[in-house]
Amino acid sequence: MKNKILNNIFMSLVLICTLLLTACVDQYQGEKNKKTDIGEKRIIVTSVAVAQITDLLDLDLVGVTDTTSFKLPKRYENVQRVGMPMGPDIEIIRSLKPTEVLSPSSLKSYLEEQFKQAKIPYRFVNMSSVGAMYDSIDEIAKEYGKEDKSAKLREEYESLLKEYEQKRKDKKKPKVLILMGLPGSFVVATNNSYVGNLTELAGGENVIHDDNEEFLPVNTEELVKLNPDIILRTSHTMSEEVMEEFDEEFKTNDIWKHFDAVKNNKVYNLDNNYFGMTATMGYKEGLKKLDEIFYKEQ
């Protein structure tokens, strides 16, 4: 158990460094196999979020990620597992002879070189925001002849956006600080992060803006000057442990007592099933939750 926790902490720290040093906001495509008929496509997916997309597009898989925290779509329950998202088993993937491996672009720095060396055809799927996710859905649908399904998904998405724009047009935007927790540490989510994007879609104003980065190191002395109305706390992994660490941080670090959000009991813990590192189709539930938090008193 101890080794598992230490391993999670190590992987989380590596992820922080990656997110702070690189901006994975584009799609990338590796060496592709010669085009075959759609029925011969052999697709592997290395994250649950991407598996949600392929499920909605009615695509079969020959390989899918392992997961301990999130639930795979039912149609993939008996599909060959290929290892965890940040460390897939390259030999298993090669043995399945994929025509394409789909991975989230946030893991590009971990996986691209491995895929290249193994001569595995790949595509990195941009899921840095809800809009980017739908653009990716359109591209995948075009590749596999599922445009009818992506068009319906796009229509539902645009209708939902209009609904939220209408709901919040006469309401005051709350100033929001978003903290993303990992075992042993936490970072601040900017407007470029998925959680930051979701906050803005729900009508909140993220107090932390950056032109490039999704996450930034925490500087509480600077954050207190921004004096957010609301503080949101979520996690990348190990949610229960991370939330306990957040509680300890807020109890023992006196600076948090100077935030109006803390004084007014406006600190909220979020479910990382809907508020994680990358966009997922669970964003609709996320919007509902944020709407309750932001506007329940208006």
Sequence positions of predicted segments:
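Bacterial signal peptide processing site
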Residues: 25-27
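Proline-aspartate-enriched helix->loop->beta-strand connector
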Residues: 90-103, 120, 220-233
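Structured C-terminal subdomain patch of bacterial secreted/periplasmic proteins
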Residues: 41-42, 134-144, 151, 155, ...
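A short, structured surface patch at a secondary-structure boundary
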Residues: 45-96, 100-105
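Bacterial N-terminal signal peptides that target proteins for export
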Residues: 2-13
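Alpha-helical, coiled-coil/dimerization segments enriched in small aliphatic residues
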Residues: 68-71, 187-215
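C-terminal motif of bacterial Sec signal peptides marking the signal peptidase cleavage site
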Residues: 21-23
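Basic- and aromatic-lined ligand-binding clefts that recognize polyanionic substrates
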Residues: 36-57, 149-202
